[in-house]
Each structure stands twice: as structure tokens, then as C-alpha cells.
């Protein structure tokens, strides 16, 4: 079930933090759920969602053991790039696979 309430109403909080609000749960019902932040980026809100969500785009790019820092359901930008760009770039977007979980590959969009 997908909840949009506070952490008490979220089935699975992001590691290291309460469930983000506002929130969206990925993947869809039947595949298990997790929380994905749709607000400005918070580094601790992270789960490997790109493999199952419509698309993920981080609001900011931070060094993290997590594959995604913050996700919002926006247009996917499937540009493959060197993963190490993420911690050093001021503006990154992930490639969003649609079928399976896999590490996020980062890109540096024009203008960043």
C-alpha cells in the first residue's frame, strides 16, 4: 500500500531517516513498497528505486552509499555516464533502468 502521511503511515521508511513527506511509494502495490522523497533533496532519504519506479531524478548529488539520494517522478533522462561524476559534480541525473535493479549511472546535464 502506498501512503502519503507521516512516517507512522509509511510502510517502509528510507534508511537512516523517517519516511519523507510528501512521499510516494515505489514500486507499485504487489512488489513491496519503499519511500521516495518528492521534496528537495535530503541525502539520507535513499533507496535503489530506479529499477522499478517510473523514473528517478535526484534533486542534488551527494557522496552516499545509497544509489539514489532523492527521487521525484519526472521525465527520465537516460544518459549513461561515469558513476564517479556523481560525488564531484554539482548537478547529476541518473539513468533510470525500467526492468531490473541495477546501480545508478550518473550523467552531468548540459548547463550544470
From Swiss-Prot:
Tissue and organ distribution: Restricted to a narrow region of the hair fiber cuticle, lying approximately 20 cell layers above the apex of the dermal papilla of the hair root; not detected in any other tissues.
Spans of repeat Sequence: 10-14, 20-24, 25-29, 35-39, 41-45, 46-50, 56-60, 61-65, 66-70, 71-75, 76-80, 81-85, 86-90, 91-95, 96-100
Domain of life according to the entry: Eukaryota
Region annotation (15 X 5 AA approximate repeats) ranges: 10-100
UniProt keywords, alphabetically: Keratin, Repeat
GO cellular component: cytosol; intermediate filament
Coiled coil region boundaries: none
Function, as annotated: In the hair cortex, hair keratin intermediate filaments are embedded in an interfilamentous matrix, consisting of hair keratin-associated proteins (KRTAP), which are essential for the formation of a rigid and resistant hair shaft through their extensive disulfide bond cross-linking with abundant cysteine residues of hair keratins. The matrix proteins include the high-sulfur and high-glycine-tyrosine keratins.
Recorded family membership: Belongs to the KRTAP type 12 family.
Self-association state and partner proteins as the record states: Interacts with hair keratins.
Protein name: Keratin-associated protein 12-4
Record lineage: Eukaryota, Metazoa, Chordata, Craniata, Vertebrata
This protein's encoding gene: KRTAP12-4
Amino acid at each position: 500500500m502506498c501512503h502519503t502521511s507521516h512516517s507512522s503511515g509509511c510502510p517502509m521508511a528510507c534508511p537512516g531517516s523517517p519516511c519523507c513527506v510528501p512521499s510516494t511509494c515505489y514500486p507499485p502495490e504487489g512488489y513491496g513498497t519503499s519511500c521516495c522523497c518528492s521534496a528537495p533533496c535530503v541525502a539520507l532519504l535513499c533507496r535503489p528505486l530506479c529499477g522499478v519506479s517510473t523514473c528517478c531524478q535526484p534533486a542534488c548529488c551527494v557522496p552516499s552509499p545509497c544509489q539514489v539520494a532523492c527521487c521525484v517522478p519526472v521525465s527520465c533522462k537516460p544518459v549513461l555516464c561515469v558513476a564517479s561524476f556523481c560525488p564531484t559534480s554539482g548537478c547529476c541525473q541518473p539513468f533510470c533502468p525500467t526492468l531490473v535493479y541495477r546501480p545508478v549511472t550518473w550523467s552531468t546535464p548540459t548547463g550544470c
